[in-house]
Amino acid sequence: MNKLFITLLLLVGCSSNPIVDNTEQITQWIFVANEGNFGASNGSISMINNNDEVYHIEEVGDVVQSLEVYKDKLIVVINNSHVIKVYDITEDGLKLPGIEISTDNSSPRELVVVDDKVYFTNWNTKDVKVLNLFNYNIETSIPVDG
């Protein structure tokens, strides 16, 4: 009886079909802000994929100050150009040219994104502005000291 059980187990338990992984590999990106030289408009973005291939988006603006990934978007603060650029992230990198939002000469610096709103600090205007990511309008300005 044991021999019969072991024989059946071996016949049923073995498969000649190899296991195939049908999942697609999704490209993941690391984004690096390259500030550039003040006044030279040569700030850039480096993109590194999960194969360690490096790509560059040149001449993004004058002083690429900071950036952040939020959902399927890359949000880039460009200080001396006084703009924020928003790019869609795709499998191939960034969808260019992106959307450019003027900050009205505020010299934006750092950002954080909460609930589809970008809160960014400003050197010239000494405030925190709030950018709505649905309509790309600056909704409000919050004065701060310093």
Where is each model-derived feature located?
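N-terminal hydrophobic targeting signals that begin at the initiator methionine
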Residues: 1-2, 15
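Sec-dependent N-terminal signal peptides
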Residues: 4-12
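Predominantly soluble domains enriched in secretory-pathway, periplasmic, or organellar proteins
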Residues: 14-146
